């Protein structure tokens, strides 16, 4: 292909800025066009190759394609089995199984197309015997399984360990020491995002969270897991919630891979991580609920362009309806449209080399690394959780964002902007859509997930 730009003189960043300033006719360039994000990043009106001193380097571990996942809660094994098989027949490429108790493995996976659809688990209990049963079952199958064991994630959500710190880690050591190449450990960062943390905080906490595992198991288990092929065996799965700040969220996932690669290299393990992404709950609403479709679509787009391995969409009515065929089908079809009709799977790493996103990736990574180092100097992530410092920082960020919403500066269409006074939801609530309080004794203060619109919605429901 011929060079279409060879007949045109190149324009430097300085020349662009001079032209913009002339067009502003006296208005201040910085005050008019440069804005500051919640993360403290000054976003410029344009980005240019002159902004970069070094050539772009590829983000480590980016996938060449991505998978459409369907979430299924296991209550009745036969129903879960039917839902999984039906979802795969209708376009799902992976299944995320959630369970609160042990289940009949053979019933859930009866006639399951193992080679066709990878399996992710989200188990809210921790049993060595049950994990062993699962591993034995899948050892005879040609499939990919992600067990997603996250002891610290459970601690941040519930305020307690499954058993206690020592016993939980001992069980995990035993599982890891079985010398398998399966994906065992996960780092669930969704609670940080849904709790109101900034993107920089999410990245720093994700890194510190992962570092607790790597540091604990460095001398105890990793050598046994890795054997002679140390750079290939261990891979951590990150669960990521994606918010509405489109370009920042693309950069967030890229920065996470970049940061993890740097951390993993220090432990001499594989620099590749696996990322499963899902839309945030924080900006979802009860009223004018169809807008949730628009929100989740752009959030899934951010996850795809950012380089997530798997996307598990959130149904538009997930806040107030129990899982239902219509909502699940629509959420799956959103991803199918992005993949099959919008061709979001035909170009790998589409964001690479885009000046704005590359700049955001670098700035977010730098700021997150600074915060990570501060956490480590303070005794590490677990110590900071124990002292309540992480929880306090997330609260402060959440309160600032809540204030922006309350003042109308952060707009949620149909809720605090262009509301429909005729909209009624009181009789349509199958689920309680607000923060649930469950008084109990905890060893740390749990991180509470809360939506921005909760107070507004509660007031509207009272008036119906």
For every predicted segment, state its role.
Residues 1-220, 231-241, 245, 448-463:
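Catalytic alpha/beta active-site cores
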Residues 34-39, 152, 189-192, 235-243, ...:
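A glycine-rich phosphate-binding loop feature that marks nucleotide/adenosyl-phosphate handling sites
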Residues 40, 91, 260, 306, ...:
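Conserved, mostly hydrophobic/aromatic
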Residues 183-210, 305-309, 314-347, 360-364, ...:
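Mobile "lid/hinge" segments at catalytic clefts and subdomain interfaces of large enzymes
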Residues 198-202, 245-255, 282-294, 321-331, ...:
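Short glycine/threonine-rich loop-to-helix capping motif typified by GTGT followed
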Residues 207-210, 239-331:
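Glycine-rich anion/phosphate-binding loop at the beta-strand->alpha-helix junction
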Residues 221-227:
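Positively charged N-terminal leader segments that act as targeting/secretion signals
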Residues 329, 333, 339-464:
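Catalytic-core signal marking the mid-to-C-terminal active-site face
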């Amino acid at each position: 292909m011929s060079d279409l730009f060879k007949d045109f003189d190149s324009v430097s960043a300085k020349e662009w800025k001079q032209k913009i300033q002339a067009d502003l006719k006296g208005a201040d360039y910085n005050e008019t066009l440069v804005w500051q994000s919640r993360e403290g990043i000054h976003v410029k009106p344009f980005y240019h190759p002159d902004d970069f001193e070094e050539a772009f380097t590829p983000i480590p571990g980016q996938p060449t394609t991505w998978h459409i996942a369907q979430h299924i809660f296991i209550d009745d094994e036969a129903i879960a089995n039917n839902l999984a098989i039906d979802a795969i027949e209708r376009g799902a490429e992976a299944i995320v199984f959630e369970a609160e108790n042990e289940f009949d493995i053979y019933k859930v996976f009866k006639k399951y197309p193992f080679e066709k659809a990878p399996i992710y688990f989200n188990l809210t209990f921790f049993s060595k015997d049950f994990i062993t049963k699962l591993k034995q079952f899948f050892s005879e199958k040609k499939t990919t399984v992600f067990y997603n064991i996250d002891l610290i994630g459970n601690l941040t959500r519930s305020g307690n360990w499954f058993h206690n710190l020592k016993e939980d880690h001992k069980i995990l050591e035993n599982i890891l020491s079985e010398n398998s190449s399966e994906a065992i450990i996960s780092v669930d960062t969704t609670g940080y995002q849904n709790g109101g943390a900034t993107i920089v905080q999410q990245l720093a906490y994700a890194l510190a969270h992962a570092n607790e595992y790597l540091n604990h198991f460095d001398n105890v288990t990793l050598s046994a897991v890795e054997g002679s092929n140390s750079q290939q065996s261990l891979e951590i799965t990150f669960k990521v919630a994606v918010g509405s700040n489109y370009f920042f969220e693309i950069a967030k996932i890229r920065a996470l891979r970049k940061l993890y690669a740097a951390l993993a290299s220090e432990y001499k393990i594989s620099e590749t991580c696996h990322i499963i992404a899902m839309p945030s709950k924080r900006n979802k609403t009860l009223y004018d609920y169809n807008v949730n479709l628009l929100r989740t679509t752009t959030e899934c787009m951010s996850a795809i362009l950012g380089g997530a391995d798997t996307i598990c969409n959130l149904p538009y009515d997930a806040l107030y309806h129990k899982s239902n065929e219509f909502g699940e089908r629509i959420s799956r079809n959103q991803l199918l449209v992005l993949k099959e009709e919008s061709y979001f799977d035909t170009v790998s790493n589409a964001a690479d080399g885009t000046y704005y996103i590359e700049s955001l990736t670098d700035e977010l990574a730098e700021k997150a690394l600074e915060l990570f180092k501060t956490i480590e100097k303070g005794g590490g992530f677990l110590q900071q959780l124990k002292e309540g410092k992480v929880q306090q920082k997330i609260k402060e960020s959440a309160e600032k964002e809540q204030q922006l919403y309350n003042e109308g500066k952060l707009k949620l269409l149909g809720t605090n902007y262009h509301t429909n006074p005729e909209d009624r939801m009181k009789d349509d609530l199958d689920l309680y859509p607000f923060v649930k309080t469950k008084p109990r004794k905890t060893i740390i203060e749990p991180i509470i997930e809360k939506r921005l619109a909760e107070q507004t919605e509660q007031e509207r429901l009272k008036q119906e």
